[in-house]
């Protein structure tokens, strides 16, 4: 502090409110804050002596925050902006800090002043929002979904467009021979996989029998997976008649249900979905068995027997998933594993929509909807969609039902003001469920629904549906009976992050977002460290929360890098490029440890059916983002061809882990394997066949064919210029050159996408590959002694179909280098010859062949 400032400002002794951080003079400490009165926090309004002393001389947050991993605020501010300090805290900035009252006396960090930063805005939708319409659904994809990431990134957008066109060309080629295969139990998106599968099987002859136990195993596994996933969909689509449904045909005896199913549910699973009073639930189940199962009475919809039936079915199915994915010995819970749950989901859907679910709701019905939402998240079937894009409608129904029933913030802020009238035919009845029980269950349900609403914002970037938040402080740990209630203290921060992200995605304050994320990390870390009870049973929640925050940071870093690239901010672009790569490596290491060193994570094996989901989403995000680094490799002098090959080997290793660990069980993972293997084949090229150059040539060629009316694209489909407008703009830039033109990459890097003309030497940037941290994926020996679904499904099919495939091409393939499983190759310098403009138009399969084997599109993957 300067002497001048010291003379102007007097430092009176003040006290600080532990709730809202409002400062008052010491003599006013007996009066509660107006903010606390408004929020109903009068009882918890306590003042502590302001320990900040002289605010303007306090150390910065960067010195006090040991968890801060990203760049400092000064590094994140764009050149020309200045960082301001303030002499006093405003309430608006103070609201950015959510503190747990019990923790504040233990940590001096929370009394450090917050430095105000000049906002720095970035555009997370440079190519607009991504909306897809199809026969069955219209979807606006969240900002951090796979589709939105690919739409934002011009390199990924071009690669995905190339991949889809090339696959369609080969499908048309097979279809012209009458080889299209459709499976009525699988969606239309599986037609390509089924067609290639059948085509391969037709061409396998007796002369390969001696070669191939591998061949037979390949066919057996592939067919069994197709059949299994087709059976999933067939079972879920099954129709029932209420008159023919007998509960005893689907439910185990009550004694087994109580001793095996409910015991497991209460001990291991209930804390994941604490929406019941277990005493009341057991009572309702006993009544249901006495009246319906044992006496053989029909299931009454009028008396809501069907809702109790559905709750039992969902609990059994969830418990069975817990045992199935625990990988424990089959002798654990043997009776549970023998229960056939294949029709349970169809039964639940049948009964749910027998009631007026879109008009009114009761407690049992709401609990059933929440269980169904939980099952969609955990189950191997494709309940939420491959990118969680189908979860919002069910979640919106749950949230609307909560509000209709009075399950909202009032059950925390004004529980004493609820006035109940419980009618005699209510279920559960008044004899078993009193008003105080309703308040307790309402609190559990609201905290659970609220967290899931916030969680989906962090996972996919979609906007929260619950638009209100409150500051929550609890006097005793007894007031937080569930993990979700404990997390209410973080809700204000999570909602602010959502608002900062979604209020205007084209103008997101990056500085504010970084500050809020760091605050969230810090507060969550302290909450986790102070958990006294149920520490063993809560680790999977803490595990998931940490991964959710990492996933959000990863997606945000990618959006940040794309913005700097468009903005030609070379210094920031290089730094964000390195930060994003480091984050990818860090998350990949976590995935590896989850699969191969899970004991160190201290996550209960019976909860893995739940934690698998967030790991699957995060690992998939790595597979989406890594190709963006490989395609950009030529922009950096410090990234040599050997480095790109290491990246490709890394992609292969992560893909092998992801698909071998999840592809056999999870429908959504299996269906991604086709495009993932094609993407890998696109990128795994020899040095003189740069993938990005070939993609650009292919798409420019396709545009020309489209203009001439010779395109393979059906006239009912969108044009390439509409699907990938950046290529149309690039074509206009290329056409400015007459006669001979420079290398197409030079035009892209220097003229069209000018950040490429800057040299690494200007900033002293040197890319760090982190080979040591990547090593586990580079030496992928985990699957060397067993079937590797990612490599075997493709390579074998390619060798079998080579002699049966005719490729319409004028280019000799004698010297074509085939991309196989990653291996060391001689390093060569990329070739960049000048090309005549009239050579841009080539035979329709020439460019495909230049990047693929002749059989790449008639293989499985």
UniProtKB/Swiss-Prot annotation:
GO terms for molecular function: DNA-binding transcription factor activity, RNA polymerase II-specific; RNA polymerase II cis-regulatory region sequence-specific DNA binding; zinc ion binding. CDD domains: GAL4. The keyword Hydrolase does not apply. Residues 19-47 bind DNA. Residues 52-99 are annotated as: Disordered. Its main location: cytoplasm. One of its GO terms (biological process) is positive regulation of transcription by RNA polymerase II. Belongs to the OAF3 family. Residues 52-61 have a biased composition (Polar residues). GO terms for cellular component: mitochondrion; nucleus. Keywords: Cytoplasm, DNA-binding, Metal-binding, Mitochondrion, Nucleus, Repressor, Transcription, Transcription regulation, Zinc. Pfam families: Zn_clus. It is found in: Cytoplasm; Nucleus; Mitochondrion. Transcriptional inhibitor with a significantly increased number of target genes in response to oleate. This is Oleate activated transcription factor 3.
């Amino acid at each position: 502090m300067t002497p001048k400032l010291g003379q102007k400002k007097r430092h009176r002794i003040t006290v600080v409110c532990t709730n809202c951080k409002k400062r008052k003079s010491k003599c006013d400490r007996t009066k509660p804050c107006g903010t606390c009165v408004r929020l109903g926090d009068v009882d918890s309004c306590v003042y502590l002596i302001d320990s900040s002393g002289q605010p303007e001389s306090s150390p910065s947050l960067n010195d006090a925050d040991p968890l801060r991993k990203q760049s400092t605020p000064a590094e994140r501010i764009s050149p020309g902006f200045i960082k301001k300090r303030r002499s006093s805290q405003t309430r608006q900035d103070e609201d950015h800090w959510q503190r747990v009252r019990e923790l504040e006396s233990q940590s001096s960090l929370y009394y450090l002043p917050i430095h105000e930063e000049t906002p720095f805005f970035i555009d997370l939708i440079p190519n607009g929002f991504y909306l897809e319409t199809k026969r069955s659904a219209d979807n606006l994809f969240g900002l951090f979904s796979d589709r939105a990431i690919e739409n934002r990134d011009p390199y990924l957008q071009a690669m995905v467009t190339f991949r889809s066109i090339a696959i369609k060309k080969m499908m048309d080629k097979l279809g012209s021979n009458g080889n299209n295969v459709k499976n009525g139990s699988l969606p239309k998106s599986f037609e390509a996989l089924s067609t290639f599968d059948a085509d391969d099987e037709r061409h396998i002859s007796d002369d390969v029998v001696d070669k191939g136990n591998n061949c037979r195993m390949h066919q057996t596994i592939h067919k069994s997976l197709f059949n299994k996933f087709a059976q999933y969909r067939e079972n879920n689509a099954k129709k029932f008649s209420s008159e023919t449904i007998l509960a005893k045909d689907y439910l185990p005896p009550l004694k087994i249900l109580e001793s095996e199913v409910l015991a497991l549910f209460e001990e291991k699973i209930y804390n994941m979905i604490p929406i019941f009073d277990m005493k009341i639930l057991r009572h309702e189940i006993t009544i249901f068995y006495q009246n319906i199962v044992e006496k053989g009475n029909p299931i009454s919809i009028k008396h809501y027997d069907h809702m109790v039936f559905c709750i039992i079915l969902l609990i059994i199915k969830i418990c069975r998933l817990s045992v199935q994915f625990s990988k424990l010995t089959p002798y654990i819970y043997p009776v549970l594993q023998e229960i056939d749950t294949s029709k349970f989901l169809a039964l639940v859907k049948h009964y749910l929509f027998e009631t007026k679910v879109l008009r009114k709701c009761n407690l049992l019905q709401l609990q059933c909807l929440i269980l169904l939402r939980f099952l969609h998240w955990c189950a191997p079937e494709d309940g939420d969609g491959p990118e969680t894009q189908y979860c919002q409608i069910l979640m919106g129904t749950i949230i609307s039902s909560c509000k209709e029933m009075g399950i909202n913030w009032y059950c925390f802020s004004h529980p004493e003001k609820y006035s109940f009238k419980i009618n005699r035919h209510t279920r559960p009845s008044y004899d078993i469920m009193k008003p105080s029980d309703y308040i307790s269950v309402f609190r559990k349900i609201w905290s659970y629904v609220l967290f899931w609403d916030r969680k989906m914002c962090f996972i996919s970037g979609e906007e929260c549906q619950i638009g209100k938040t409150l500051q929550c402080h609890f006097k005793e740990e007894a007031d937080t009976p569930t993990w979700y209630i404990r997390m209410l203290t973080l809700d204000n921060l999570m909602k602010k992050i959502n608002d900062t992200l979604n209020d205007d995605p084209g103008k997101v304050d990056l500085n504010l977002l970084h500050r809020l994320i760091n605050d969230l990390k810090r507060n969550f870390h302290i909450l986790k460290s102070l958990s006294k009870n149920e520490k063993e049973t809560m680790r999977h929640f803490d595990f998931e929360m940490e991964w959710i925050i990492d996933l959000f940071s990863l997606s945000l870093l990618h959006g940040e890098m794309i913005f700097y690239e468009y903005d030609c901010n070379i210094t920031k672009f290089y730094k964000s490029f390195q930060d994003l790569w480091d984050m990818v490596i860090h998350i990949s290491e976590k995935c590896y440890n989850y699969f191969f060193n899970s004991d160190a994570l201290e996550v209960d094996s019976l909860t893995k059916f739940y934690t698998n989901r967030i790991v699957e989403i995060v690992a998939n995000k790595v597979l989406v983002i890594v190709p963006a680094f490989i395609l950009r490799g030529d922009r950096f002098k410090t990234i040599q061809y050997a480095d790109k090959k290491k990246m490709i080997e890394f992609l292969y290793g992560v893909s092998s882990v992801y698909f071998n660990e999840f592809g056999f069980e999870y429908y959504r993972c299996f269906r991604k394997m086709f495009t993932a293997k094609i993407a890998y084949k696109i990128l795994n090229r020899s040095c003189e066949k740069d993938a990005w150059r070939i993609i650009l040539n292919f798409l420019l060629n396709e545009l020309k064919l489209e203009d001439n009316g010779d395109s393979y694209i059906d006239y009912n489909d969108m044009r390439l210029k509409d699907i990938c407008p950046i290529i149309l703009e690039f074509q206009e830039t290329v056409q400015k050159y007459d006669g001979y033109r420079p290398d197409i990459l030079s035009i892209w890097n220097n003229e069209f996408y000018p950040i490429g003309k800057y040299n690494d030497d200007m900033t002293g940037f040197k890319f760090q590959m982190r080979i040591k941290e990547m090593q586990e994926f580079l030496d992928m020996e985990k699957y060397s002694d067993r079937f590797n679904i990612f490599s075997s499904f493709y390579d074998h099919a390619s060798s079998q179909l080579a002699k049966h495939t005719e490729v319409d091409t004028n280019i000799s393939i004698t010297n074509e280098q085939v991309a196989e499983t990653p291996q060391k190759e001689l390093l060569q310098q990329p070739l960049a010859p000048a090309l005549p403009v009239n050579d841009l138009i080539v035979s329709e399969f020439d460019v495909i062949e230049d990047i693929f084997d002749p059989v790449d599109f008639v293989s499985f993957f």
